[in-house]
C-alpha cells in the first residue's frame, strides 16, 4: 500500500521466485483477495505475506477485526498455501501446518514475558497468555504437492507468513503500522 499498489499485485509484479508466486496466487485465489479488496468493511482489514525457509515456501492471507477505540485485534480467518516439495503424508502435513498457524498466533498477538523493576511478572504458565480455543480463527490450508522436488522442511515454515500478514491486515483495518511482536492492542489507540 505504501507503494501505491495493491499488496498482492505489487508482490506478483516483483517476485521472481516461481514457487513463491505459486503459493501466493493459490492463497489469494482461495481467500478471495481481489473480491475482498473491492468490498471494504469498517474496522476490518486484510493482509498477506509470503516467505521461504528450509527449502519450503508459504503464503498467508488474513482477515482481522481491529478497533482503534478498544485496541482489540481479532484474527477472523487465515488462508495459507504451503509447498515443501514432494508431500509424503498429506494429513500429517496439514495438521503440522495448521498447528504452526495456531502457535504463531500466540506469538503474534499474546505471548510475551513481562518485566517490572527487573522481575518477571508472568513467571508461571498460569500468567503467560497463550491462544485459547476461542482465539483460533477459521484456518484453510492449501498444500501444493511438487513430486518433482525433494521433500523439504515442513516444521516451521508455515509460521513465517502469519505475523506479517496479521500486521498488514491491522494496518489495512485502521491505518496503524505495528512493527514488533506481540502486536500490542494499546498501540492502536495511542
Where are the regions a protein language model picked out?
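Cofactor-binding beta-sheet edge motifs in enzyme active sites
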Residues: 1-190
Amino acid at each position: 500500500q505504501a507503494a501505491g499498489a495493491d499488496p498482492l499485485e505489487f508482490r506478483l509484479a516483483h517476485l521472481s521466485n516461481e514457487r513463491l508466486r505459486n503459493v501466493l496466487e493459490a492463497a489469494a485465489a482461495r481467500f478471495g483477495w481481489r473480491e475482498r479488496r473491492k468490498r471494504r468493511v469498517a474496522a476490518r482489514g486484510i493482509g498477506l505475506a509470503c516467505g521461504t525457509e528450509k527449502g519450503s515456501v508459504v503464503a498467508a492471507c488474513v482477515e482481522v477485526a481491529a478497533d482503534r477505540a478498544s485496541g482489540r485485534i481479532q484474527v477472523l480467518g487465515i488462508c495459507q498455501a504451503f509447498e515443501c516439495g514432494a508431500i509424503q503424508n498429506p494429513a500429517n502435513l496439514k495438521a503440522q501446518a495448521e498447528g504452526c498457524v495456531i502457535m504463531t498466533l500466540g506469538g503474534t498477538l499474546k505471548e510475551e514475558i513481562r518485566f517490572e523493576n527487573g522481575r518477571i511478572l508472568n513467571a508461571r504458565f498460569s500468567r503467560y497468555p497463550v491462544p485459547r480455543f476461542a482465539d483460533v480463527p477459521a484456518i484453510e490450508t492449501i498444500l501444493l504437492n511438487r513430486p518433482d522436488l525433494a521433500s523439504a522442511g515442513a516444521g516451521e515454515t508455515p509460521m513465517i507468513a502469519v505475523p506479517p500478514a496479521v500486521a498488514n491486515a491491522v494496518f489495512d483495518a485502521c491505518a496503524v503500522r505495528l512493527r514488533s511482536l506481540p502486536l500490542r492492542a494499546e498501540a492502536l489507540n495511542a
